[in-house]
Structure formats: C-alpha cells, structure tokens
Amino acid sequence: MAAKDSKLAGTGKVTALGTALRPLNSEYGKVAPGWGTTILMSVFIGLFAVFIVILLEIYNKSLILDNVGVNWLSSTGL
C-alpha cells in the first residue's frame, strides 16, 4: 500500500484553488467529541418544519390571513 501511495503523491497538478482549500481537508475523518452541533441542528430543523407547516396552511387556506389574496391567476387578464 505504501508503494501505491508514493506513486500517487507525485501525480497531479498543484493549483491555487487546491492550495487554498487544503486546510478544509485537514479535518477529514475527525469527529467532534460529544454531541457537537447536534442540538443547534435540531433547532434549525424544527424551525424549518414550522415554516413548512405555515406555508402549507396558507396554501390550503386553513390559515386565514386578512387582506392577503391567494389568487394564482394573473390579474391583468393575459
């Protein structure tokens, strides 16, 4: 396996973009200890679910908003 890796090490082209993105790849395979950002991610998923439910209620007209028309037809009559 080491011989194969040494062959691949010399191949490829060094680019400015690759050099700039190299620090992002240095964390590959590492796992944050504990729960990490799971709680924050769960909060955002919950907020997104509430947003989707509100949109569905507006679309189904089960959430009535005063003075907000939901007419999908063009008002110009084209």
From Swiss-Prot:
UniProt key word Ribosomal protein:
no
List the transmembrane segments.
39-59
Where does this one sit in the cell?
Plastid, Chloroplast thylakoid membrane
Q: Show the GO MF annotations.
A: phosphate ion binding
Q: Mention one GO biological process in which this protein takes part, according to its record.
A: photosynthesis
Q: Which UniProt keywords apply?
A: Chloroplast, Membrane, Photosynthesis, Photosystem II, Plastid, Thylakoid, Transmembrane, Transmembrane helix
Q: Which Gene3D superfamilies match?
A: Photosystem II reaction center protein H
One Gene Ontology term, aspect cellular component: photosystem II
What topology does it adopt in the membrane? Single-pass membrane protein
Functionally, this protein is described as follows: One of the components of the core complex of photosystem II (PSII), required for its stability and/or assembly. PSII is a light-driven water:plastoquinone oxidoreductase that uses light energy to abstract electrons from H(2)O, generating O(2) and a proton gradient subsequently used for ATP formation. It consists of a core antenna complex that captures photons, and an electron transfer chain that converts photonic excitation into a charge separation.
Q: Which family does it belong to?
A: Belongs to the PsbH family.
Q: Mind telling me which HAMAP family this protein's record contains? A: PSII_PsbH
What does the subunit comment say?
A: PSII is composed of 1 copy each of membrane proteins PsbA, PsbB, PsbC, PsbD, PsbE, PsbF, PsbH, PsbI, PsbJ, PsbK, PsbL, PsbM, PsbT, PsbX, PsbY, PsbZ, Psb30/Ycf12, at least 3 peripheral proteins of the oxygen-evolving complex and a large number of cofactors. It forms dimeric complexes.
**Descriptive protein name:** Photosystem II reaction center protein H
**Species in which this protein is naturally found:** Ostreococcus tauri
What's the gene?
Answer: psbH
